[in-house]
Amino acid sequence: MSSCVERYVRGWMTDDLDMILTACADDFVYDDPIDGRFNKAEFADYFRGLGEVEIAWSEAVQEADGKETFWMWWTWKPKGAAESSLGAALVKAGPDGVHSEKVASYKH
């Protein structure tokens, strides 16, 4: 697993926005089917409003072109909500950082 992927995952696990952003490539896009798409510049505001997030992740798969793909599973409890949401995310990364994360909710 590349250092940018490790940093990205560690950032989510420790609720460290700066760590997440430094792991992202300039063209980073976070795609949430409920809340919309956020580029790297917009992501900080989105992240600050998330509430409590817990993640687990799988090993990264190295692709032929040198990029990495991995899955993250998450539990999210929005601020002020009584129940948590569950979901997964597909993350794509290259040598220059994480390029995208596309999330899907199982329960919302």
Task: Annotate each predicted stretch with a short phrase.
Residues 2-3:
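Amphipathic alpha-helical repeat elements characteristic of tetratricopeptide repeat
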Residues 6-10, 22-35:
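Short, solvent-exposed secondary-structure junction/capping segments
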Residues 11-14, 49:
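A structural signal for alpha-helix termini and helix-coil/disorder junctions
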Residues 15-19:
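Short helix-adjacent coil turns
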Residues 41-108:
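A beta-strand edge to alpha-helix "cap/lid" segment located at domain peripheries
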